Amino acid sequence: MAVSRMAALSLATCTRVASRAAMSALRAPAPALGSLQTAAIAPLKAAGFSAHQMVQRPTWSLTRSFHRSPVVCAELTRSLSRSPSGEFETLEYRLFFQNDQGETLSPWHDIPLRAGDGLFNFICEIPKDTSAKMEVATDEPGTPIKQDVKKGKIRYYPYNIHWNYGMLPQTWEDPSHANPEVDNTMGDNDPVDVVEIGEKQAALGEVYAVKPLAVLAMIDDGELDWKVICIRADDPKADLVNDVDDVEKEFPGTLTAVRDWFRDYKIPDGKPPNKFGLDNKPADKATALRVIQETNEFWAKLVKRATPRNGLSLV
């Protein structure tokens, strides 16, 4: 099929538009993808808007597709910008994603999974050497990035994470699926997590291509929480690592360090260590690719309403 025809089919898929006129008048220009600025919200507070009413999402235009061509994928990710609302590290903070027309896109649903040439798009939720527990809000329209909250307070890890951490778009760990490879453990109802081990610190919300290398089957509170180990495609060592054994050669001790970090990070809060399936070892690239494929299929069923959405936002 010609690329132009594939692009036309992709852009015609699942378009849905709604507007918020009152918010549109107050909306500030979106910053470029490489910058991160806090949006001015004083006029909204003065007008009496609540914190969640101040979220800037006046226009929805979803161009979701299950099979975008690499050309369409590249054009979409290049045109992305990030639009913050509220003060960083507060309950009100949200980071939205927009295209070059200023239309809000869901980082979970609208950014394509595949980036071409065996690579996948990665969305950084927690930059390396930081501790604020940021995450895509899967239950909010637009699925912006926000800081995790527990008992009304924003959450932090007890210490910095040493790698870029985030998620693969268009994936979902189905909580109704019992995985036979991991003692029939059910999915955790979230997108698949990624630990990106490259040397560069990513920006919050940065989207870039990564190469999968290995995967850990973490079991958190009885739920399966895959951790796909990746490296960014433009890292100086990206060409030297292609599978789990290469990681140990080029990044000695890293796989053990990743496993131990995620095993132990809840201990300072008085909780037991997390467990791991697959013999407590990182599995190879082939297993990682199977996990990505399977969870992409779970996501496709979710957005087609073939699976109960369990309070998740599909826009």
Q: Residue spans of the language-model regions?
A:
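PEST-like, low-complexity acidic/proline-rich intrinsically disordered segments
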Residues: 1-16
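Hydrophobic N-terminal alpha-helices or hydrophobic patches in metabolic proteins across all domains
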Residues: 14, 27-29, 36, 43-315
